Amino acid sequence: MALQRLSFFLMSQKGLQVLKGVYSQFGNNVFEFVVSSRDMAIEKDFYEEIMSFCLDVQIPFFERKDSPEVISAYTIAISWRWLISAQGGLIVLHDSLLPRYRGFAPLVNSLKNGEPEIGVTALVASEEYDKGEILGNKKVEVRYPLKISEAIDIVAPLYQLLVNELLEQLFSTGNLLSRPQIEEDATYSLWLDEGDYKIDWDNDSEFIARFVDAVGFPYNGATTEMERETIKILAGKVVPDVIIENRTSGKVIFMDNGRPVVVCGRGLYKIEEAVNSAGQSILPLKKFRVKFK
């Protein structure tokens, strides 16, 4: 097996797991260097862990702004959001089973939609995002409720397995096999901004439960307004619906040991953990006549 050196642009828990997996199987001689960056959009970005591991095992490490020129024949990018000027082949790992969920935050949006399978796709980078030929994928069936942190724990080993299989193929044959995507099956996933973390109480309670779980840690968490204050919903669950003659989404209908049960467009949702902007719990809620917006 003829080893080659590759450049790695890695972020997130998935990037860390791939880093450890590649090192474990192939040693540090396959690393030209590793580049990482902090991510202010999420609570936990694994930058320190990636840097520390590289330093511990003597893999050249660079912060994004100090990134050297890429001279390796192949480059692997995981959870990377910036352009990479690679001379050779650029391999991107994407958080969905392409061609579905091309674009941004595919795992988050997959969980919101209650997809029965989640996974990862390795593809050749292209000018149009996520339209390159597929090098391989891995998938797993999931059940709900499922928090985003749990989903990441599930898919991270798939990243490691897929990358190691691709490297074995590359080192054994000198090249990588690919196949075109089926364009008719393509869907797209939009980027998220602050407004995308806000709960729409007009949605049904099943969707709201998945939404809260999908945007939780390491993301910034689902938000709603209560008496002109933004609060963050950390956990909750669907409870059986009742017949409401004058249904109004967002209003509290019951209180269960200080935990408000909120009317949704369809169904009811009980808030079990919630904090204010200072990170302090707002529960048990003392006021009954509350409407979340």
Question: Model features per residue range: what roles?
Answer:
Residues 227-242, 269-277:
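A short acidic-to-branched-hydrophobic micro-motif
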Residues 1-219, 223, 254-260, 264-270, ...:
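One-carbon transfer enzymes
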Residues 237-260:
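A conserved acidic, glycine/proline-rich C-terminal tail/linker
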